[in-house]
Each structure stands twice: as structure tokens, then as C-alpha cells.
């Protein structure tokens, strides 16, 4: 349980750093049509229905006024969020693919990445943090985000 608390603290720090950098500096206008200035990519928690989840919705609601006139949208990470925790890697893979797409299509868009509960584990995989608990071989683990995308 102690390690899980540190994961939550780590995710909160990551989000706070992202918010600080977005609020403190001017975000350049997105270059491509249809690209937001800022996009929240969020992985919902275990057993939450598809979408951003309770924590993701709250974070998006907090981001909008903090960023003033800058356009903000959100991408809900597509993964089962079930009690089959080996599928957490599906969320990491979906987020990784979406990040690569955004970097290619909307290079000036600032990305804020977050997750809650199992979603935080999916996001942690992108940073190369190994999953907690038991694994069978390499199942349940996703490759870290390509440094060129970070």
C-alpha cells in the first residue's frame, strides 16, 4: 500500500509540473487545423466506464480556467480498465500510439498525460516504470515511450 501511495504522489507531481509549465509559459498556437493548444490524455481508473473517468473529468475542468483563452481538449485512453490487470498494457499502448499521432499531426500542441488507479499504472509504463505485482514473462508490460516523443 505504501508503494501505491507513492505512485499517486508521483502522478500528482507530474500533473502539477505539467500545469505549472503550461500556466507559466506562453503556449504557441497549434500549427495544424483542428489542433488544440493543449490536450489532456487521461487513463481512467479500474472499473470506470469508457471516458476520462471521475478524476480525468475533474482535471479537465481544472485545466480549462487555468489555461485562459488557450484551447483545451481531451483524449480518453482506450483500454478495458477491468480487473484483468494484464490488460493495463493495452492502455499504455493506446496512449503511446495517440501521443505519436499528436506529435506528428499537431506538433505545437502541449500534451498533459495523467491517469488514476489502473490508469496511473498504464501511464507509468510509458515512463518505463515496471508494473507492480506479479507478471507472467513480459505479459502485462508495455515498452516505454520512445524518447523522441517525450
Where are these regions (language model features)?
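Active-site catalytic motif of lipid deacylating hydrolases and related acyltransferases
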Residues: 33-110
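Serine-dependent carboxylesterase/thioesterase catalytic core
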Residues: 93-114, 118-150
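Bacterial N-terminal signal peptides that target proteins for export
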Residues: 1-13
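C-terminal region of N-terminal signal peptides and the immediate post-cleavage residues
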Residues: 18-35, 134
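Polar low-complexity intrinsically disordered regions enriched in Ser/Thr and small residues
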Residues: 13, 27-28, 143
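Hydrophobic alpha-helical membrane segments, chiefly transmembrane helices and signal peptide h-regions
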Residues: 14-23, 40, 120-125
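Short amphipathic alpha-helical surface micro-motifs
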Residues: 22-24, 57-59, 132-139
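Cytoplasmic membrane-interface segments at the C-terminal ends of transmembrane helices
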Residues: 2-3, 27, 103
Amino acid at each position: 500500500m505504501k508503494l501505491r501511495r507513492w505512485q499517486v504522489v508521483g502522478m500528482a507531481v507530474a500533473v502539477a509540473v505539467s500545469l505549472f509549465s503550461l500556466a507559466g509559459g506562453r503556449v504557441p498556437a497549434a500549427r495544424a487545423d483542428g489542433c488544440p493548444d493543449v490536450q489532456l490524455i487521461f487513463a481512467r481508473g479500474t472499473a470506470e466506464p469508457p471516458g476520462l473517468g471521475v478524476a480525468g473529468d475533474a482535471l479537465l475542468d481544472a485545466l480549462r480556467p487555468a489555461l485562459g483563452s488557450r484551447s483545451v481538449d481531451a483524449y480518453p485512453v482506450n483500454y478495458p480498465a477491468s480487473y484483468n490487470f494484464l490488460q493495463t498494457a493495452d492502455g499504455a499502448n493506446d496512449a503511446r500510439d495517440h501521443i505519436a499521432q499528436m506529435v506528428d499531426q499537431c506538433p505545437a500542441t502541449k500534451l498533459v498525460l495523467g491517469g488514476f488507479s489502473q490508469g496511473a499504472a498504464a501511464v507509468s509504463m510509458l515512463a518505463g516504470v515496471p508494473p507492480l505485482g506479479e507478471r507472467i514473462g513480459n505479459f502485462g508490460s508495455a515498452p516505454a515511450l520512445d524518447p523522441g516523443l517525450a
